[in-house]
Amino acid sequence: MVFQSFILGNLVYLCMKIINSVVVVGLYYGFLTTFSIGPSYLFLLRARVMDEGEEGTEKKVSATTGFIAGQLMMFISIYYAPLHLALGRPHTITVLALPYLLFHFFFWNNHKHFFDYGSTTRNEMRNLRIQCVFPNNLIFKLFNHLILPSSMLARLVNIYMFRCNNKMLFVTSSFVVCVRMLLVEWAFPLFQLFLVMKV
């Protein structure tokens, strides 16, 4: 009887240590960081669903790369306070947003005239359209705080600052979850598509 209560007590203690460990907390908040859905997912979804053909595949890769770069910048801003403060200031967002909005509304919406250079080849114009998809997804990911603000980033920063003593292990475990999601969601289907196209 004493031996069973000793084993049960040690098992409960071990479970509590595992649940309250930095790795589990990092994995949990890594999931929250990965799944914080905002309006930037609409651009990614548009590029992945609507475009077809060779140009569509290149746009999908460009949109996914821009989205991942924006997600990585937001993820780094959680753990790097100067970047978090820079992205949170209204003047920084204005400096980023004004040229983007001017370009987007005056040139991109008028793309028939904007891409009509006269002496350029079709591939050069197509490459310019594909290259414009990358900054569109990257910058719009940073605009999440301006357009539809979410308290997810602020909560993660506060919990990170007050919860964990071993900050490097927390960052590593959070990053492992984000990389795993990236591999499962985007890299593996692209690899399958590559294998199908080779055969």
From Swiss-Prot:
The chain crosses the membrane at residues 22-44, 65-87, 91-108. It is a multi-pass membrane protein. Signal peptide: none annotated. The keyword Cytoplasm does not apply. Its main location: mitochondrion. It is found in: Mitochondrion membrane. One of its GO terms (cellular component) is mitochondrial membrane. Keywords: Membrane, Mitochondrion, Transmembrane, Transmembrane helix. It holds the Pfam family Ycf1. Coiled coil: none annotated. Belongs to the ycf1 family. A stretch of 270 kb of the mitochondrial genome is duplicated within the centromere of chromosome 2 resulting in the duplication of the gene. The expression of this duplicated gene (At2g07739) is not demonstrated. This is Uncharacterized mitochondrial protein AtMg00370. It comes from Arabidopsis thaliana.
